[in-house]
Design a protein with these regions (language model features):
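A short SAM/SAH-binding and catalytic strip from SAM-dependent methyltransferases
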Residues: 124-137
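Conserved N-terminal segment of class I S-adenosyl-L-methionine
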Residues: 1-73, 77-120, 129, 192
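Short, conserved loop/helix-junction motifs that constitute active-site signature segments
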Residues: 144-148
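Rossmann-like AdoMet/SAM-dependent catalytic core
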Residues: 167-198
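Conserved beta-strand signature within the Rossmann-like core of class I S-adenosyl-L-methionine
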Residues: 149-161
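Extended catalytic core of nucleotide-activated donor transferases of GT-like folds
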Residues: 66, 137-140
Protein backbone atom coordinates (compact mmCIF):
# COMPACT_ATOMS: atom_id res chain seq x y z
CA UNK A 1 0.00 0.00 0.00
CA UNK A 2 1.15 3.52 -0.74
CA UNK A 3 1.07 5.83 2.31
CA UNK A 4 -1.01 9.02 2.16
CA UNK A 5 1.98 11.37 2.36
CA UNK A 6 3.75 9.51 -0.45
CA UNK A 7 0.63 9.57 -2.63
CA UNK A 8 0.13 13.31 -2.00
CA UNK A 9 3.76 14.07 -2.83
CA UNK A 10 3.58 12.02 -6.03
CA UNK A 11 0.30 13.53 -7.22
CA UNK A 12 1.45 17.10 -6.52
CA UNK A 13 4.83 16.58 -8.20
CA UNK A 14 3.12 15.25 -11.33
CA UNK A 15 0.61 18.08 -11.67
CA UNK A 16 1.20 20.00 -14.88
CA UNK A 17 -1.63 22.50 -14.44
CA UNK A 18 -0.34 25.70 -12.95
CA UNK A 19 -2.25 26.80 -9.89
CA UNK A 20 -3.69 23.35 -9.07
CA UNK A 21 -2.46 20.75 -6.61
CA UNK A 22 -3.16 17.79 -8.83
CA UNK A 23 -3.99 18.89 -12.35
CA UNK A 24 -7.38 18.40 -13.95
CA UNK A 25 -9.32 16.59 -11.19
CA UNK A 26 -9.73 17.45 -7.55
CA UNK A 27 -8.66 14.26 -5.75
CA UNK A 28 -9.04 13.01 -2.19
CA UNK A 29 -6.16 11.22 -0.49
CA UNK A 30 -7.53 10.06 2.84
CA UNK A 31 -8.84 13.25 4.46
CA UNK A 32 -6.68 15.53 2.31
CA UNK A 33 -8.30 17.22 -0.68
CA UNK A 34 -5.98 18.15 -3.55
CA UNK A 35 -7.50 20.92 -5.66
CA UNK A 36 -7.85 20.41 -9.40
CA UNK A 37 -9.50 22.35 -12.22
CA UNK A 38 -12.63 20.14 -12.18
CA UNK A 39 -14.38 18.83 -9.09
CA UNK A 40 -15.72 15.28 -9.66
CA UNK A 41 -17.91 15.37 -6.55
CA UNK A 42 -19.71 18.48 -7.81
CA UNK A 43 -19.72 17.20 -11.38
CA UNK A 44 -21.55 13.98 -10.53
CA UNK A 45 -23.74 15.34 -7.71
CA UNK A 46 -26.85 15.96 -9.84
CA UNK A 47 -26.56 12.76 -11.89
CA UNK A 48 -29.62 10.63 -11.12
CA UNK A 49 -28.07 7.24 -11.86
CA UNK A 50 -27.56 4.31 -9.52
CA UNK A 51 -23.93 3.22 -9.86
CA UNK A 52 -24.38 0.31 -7.43
CA UNK A 53 -22.73 -2.81 -8.87
CA UNK A 54 -22.46 -1.15 -12.29
CA UNK A 55 -19.62 -1.70 -14.77
CA UNK A 56 -18.23 1.65 -15.90
CA UNK A 57 -15.97 2.74 -18.77
CA UNK A 58 -14.38 6.21 -18.64
CA UNK A 59 -12.96 7.31 -22.01
CA UNK A 60 -10.41 10.07 -21.47
CA UNK A 61 -10.37 9.49 -17.71
CA UNK A 62 -7.47 11.88 -17.03
CA UNK A 63 -6.53 11.43 -13.35
CA UNK A 64 -9.48 9.16 -12.68
CA UNK A 65 -11.37 11.60 -10.49
CA UNK A 66 -14.81 10.55 -11.70
CA UNK A 67 -14.10 6.87 -11.08
CA UNK A 68 -12.56 7.45 -7.66
CA UNK A 69 -15.72 9.36 -6.75
CA UNK A 70 -17.84 6.21 -7.30
CA UNK A 71 -15.26 3.51 -6.46
CA UNK A 72 -17.20 2.23 -3.43
CA UNK A 73 -20.37 1.67 -5.47
CA UNK A 74 -19.31 0.10 -8.77
CA UNK A 75 -18.63 -3.56 -9.49
CA UNK A 76 -15.68 -2.48 -11.61
CA UNK A 77 -14.54 0.45 -13.69
CA UNK A 78 -11.98 0.98 -16.42
CA UNK A 79 -10.37 4.33 -17.20
CA UNK A 80 -8.52 4.95 -20.45
CA UNK A 81 -6.33 7.91 -21.37
CA UNK A 82 -3.52 8.54 -23.87
CA UNK A 83 -1.28 10.22 -21.27
CA UNK A 84 0.86 7.76 -19.30
CA UNK A 85 1.60 10.45 -16.68
CA UNK A 86 -2.06 10.77 -15.68
CA UNK A 87 -2.55 6.99 -15.75
CA UNK A 88 0.45 6.61 -13.42
CA UNK A 89 -1.25 9.09 -11.07
CA UNK A 90 -4.45 7.03 -11.27
CA UNK A 91 -2.55 3.90 -10.34
CA UNK A 92 -0.81 5.56 -7.38
CA UNK A 93 -4.19 6.64 -5.98
CA UNK A 94 -5.71 3.25 -6.83
CA UNK A 95 -3.00 1.50 -4.79
CA UNK A 96 -3.38 3.98 -1.92
CA UNK A 97 -7.17 3.49 -1.86
CA UNK A 98 -6.92 -0.31 -2.33
CA UNK A 99 -9.44 0.20 -5.14
CA UNK A 100 -9.01 -3.21 -6.74
CA UNK A 101 -12.22 -2.76 -8.72
CA UNK A 102 -10.67 0.10 -10.73
CA UNK A 103 -8.23 -0.38 -13.60
CA UNK A 104 -6.49 2.23 -15.73
CA UNK A 105 -4.88 1.80 -19.15
CA UNK A 106 -2.95 3.89 -21.65
CA UNK A 107 -4.43 3.95 -25.16
CA UNK A 108 -4.57 6.57 -27.89
CA UNK A 109 -8.32 6.68 -28.46
CA UNK A 110 -7.89 7.97 -32.02
CA UNK A 111 -5.80 4.95 -33.05
CA UNK A 112 -7.25 2.31 -30.73
CA UNK A 113 -9.19 -0.56 -32.26
CA UNK A 114 -12.61 -0.19 -30.66
CA UNK A 115 -13.00 -3.97 -30.50
CA UNK A 116 -10.26 -3.88 -27.85
CA UNK A 117 -12.72 -2.17 -25.51
CA UNK A 118 -14.61 -5.46 -25.38
CA UNK A 119 -11.58 -7.02 -23.63
CA UNK A 120 -12.23 -4.77 -20.64
CA UNK A 121 -16.03 -5.04 -20.54
CA UNK A 122 -18.89 -5.51 -20.69
CA UNK A 123 -20.04 -2.11 -19.45
CA UNK A 124 -23.36 -0.77 -18.24
CA UNK A 125 -22.44 2.89 -18.64
CA UNK A 126 -19.67 4.82 -20.39
CA UNK A 127 -18.35 8.25 -19.46
CA UNK A 128 -17.28 10.49 -22.32
CA UNK A 129 -16.73 13.79 -20.58
CA UNK A 130 -15.54 16.84 -22.48
CA UNK A 131 -13.77 14.60 -25.01
CA UNK A 132 -15.40 15.28 -28.39
CA UNK A 133 -13.37 18.40 -29.02
CA UNK A 134 -10.15 16.40 -28.70
CA UNK A 135 -11.13 13.15 -30.45
CA UNK A 136 -11.17 12.80 -34.22
CA UNK A 137 -13.22 9.60 -33.87
CA UNK A 138 -15.78 10.98 -31.41
CA UNK A 139 -18.70 9.85 -33.60
CA UNK A 140 -17.31 6.32 -33.74
CA UNK A 141 -17.11 6.21 -29.94
CA UNK A 142 -20.66 7.50 -29.47
CA UNK A 143 -21.89 4.82 -31.88
CA UNK A 144 -19.90 2.13 -30.04
CA UNK A 145 -21.32 3.28 -26.70
CA UNK A 146 -24.82 3.33 -28.20
CA UNK A 147 -24.42 -0.28 -29.31
CA UNK A 148 -22.62 -1.65 -26.25
CA UNK A 149 -23.87 0.29 -23.21
CA UNK A 150 -27.24 0.95 -21.62
CA UNK A 151 -26.25 4.46 -20.58
CA UNK A 152 -23.74 7.24 -21.20
CA UNK A 153 -22.68 10.17 -19.05
CA UNK A 154 -21.58 12.71 -21.64
CA UNK A 155 -20.24 16.24 -21.48
CA UNK A 156 -20.33 18.26 -24.68
CA UNK A 157 -17.31 20.26 -25.75
CA UNK A 158 -16.28 22.28 -28.78
CA UNK A 159 -18.14 24.20 -31.46
CA UNK A 160 -20.35 21.29 -32.63
CA UNK A 161 -22.17 20.51 -29.39
CA UNK A 162 -25.60 20.35 -31.05
CA UNK A 163 -24.26 17.70 -33.45
CA UNK A 164 -22.94 15.69 -30.48
CA UNK A 165 -26.36 15.78 -28.80
CA UNK A 166 -28.13 14.81 -32.03
CA UNK A 167 -25.93 11.73 -32.47
CA UNK A 168 -26.47 10.69 -28.85
CA UNK A 169 -30.23 11.04 -29.39
CA UNK A 170 -30.03 8.41 -32.15
CA UNK A 171 -29.08 5.87 -29.47
CA UNK A 172 -30.45 7.17 -26.17
CA UNK A 173 -33.00 9.30 -24.41
CA UNK A 174 -30.94 12.39 -23.61
CA UNK A 175 -31.49 14.37 -20.42
CA UNK A 176 -29.60 17.58 -19.69
CA UNK A 177 -28.25 17.38 -16.13
CA UNK A 178 -26.43 20.72 -16.18
CA UNK A 179 -26.49 23.20 -19.03
CA UNK A 180 -23.17 24.71 -17.90
CA UNK A 181 -20.01 23.23 -16.36
CA UNK A 182 -20.08 25.19 -13.11
CA UNK A 183 -17.53 22.91 -11.41
CA UNK A 184 -14.76 24.21 -13.72
CA UNK A 185 -12.44 26.46 -11.72
CA UNK A 186 -11.17 27.99 -14.98
CA UNK A 187 -14.72 29.25 -15.60
CA UNK A 188 -15.04 27.44 -18.93
CA UNK A 189 -18.79 27.02 -18.60
CA UNK A 190 -19.95 26.38 -22.16
CA UNK A 191 -20.30 22.57 -21.81
CA UNK A 192 -23.46 20.58 -21.08
CA UNK A 193 -23.58 17.49 -18.88
CA UNK A 194 -25.97 14.87 -20.25
CA UNK A 195 -27.29 11.58 -18.89
CA UNK A 196 -28.21 9.34 -21.79
CA UNK A 197 -30.27 6.22 -21.07
CA UNK A 198 -32.25 3.58 -22.97
Amino acid sequence: MIKSNDAITYLKSHSHKKGYDTGYHTLKVGTTVLKGQRNPEERIFDVDYDFTKKRVLDLGCNRGGMLFEIQDKVEYAVGIDHDSNVINCCNVLRCHNKANNLNFYVHDLDTMNLQDLNLYGPFDIAFMLSMSRWLKKWKTYINWIGTNCKACLFETNGSNQDEQIELLAEHFNVKIINDHSFDDANKVYDRKLLLCTK
